[in-house]
Design a protein with these regions (language model features):
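Amphipathic alpha-helical assembly/interaction segments
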Residues: 1-112
Length: 112
């Protein structure tokens, strides 16, 4: 197992991707751009966490973690839009926000 795979923040980010994937393809016609934006932002989180762990300098690591954090914030906003448009239910919205809250909190500490 690689270092980043042992991180709780990475596992939470992977759980968030797993939460998103089932309903992305099921979004009604006309919402493809929103689905694509969420897909890219959600997948960016664990990918940037892995990339940060491969960085050698602490400033480089912090910058890459900050990018992952920005993607997590973007996902939270997209989840709010999806809920407002009634494209996801309250349970999925709540679970997504719980995971993203944990991810953002951990990434904020890693950015320091």
């Amino acid at each position: 197992m690689l270092t980043f795979q042992r991180l709780d923040v990475y596992r939470c980010a992977i759980d968030f991707v797993a939460l998103c994937v089932p309903f992305l393809d099921g979004l009604p016609r006309g919402h493809a751009a929103l689905a694509d934006q969420l897909r890219r932002a959600a997948m960016s989180i664990p990918l940037n966490i892995a990339q940060a762990e491969g960085r050698t300098g602490s400033a480089d690591k912090a910058r890459t973690y900050a990018i992952a954090r920005g993607s997590a914030m973007e996902c939270a906003a997209i989840f709010d839009v999806l809920r407002t448009l009634a494209l996801i239910d309250d349970a999925a919205h709540r679970r997504g926000n719980e995971l993203l809250d944990r991810v953002v909190s951990m990434l904020t500490r890693l950015c320091r």
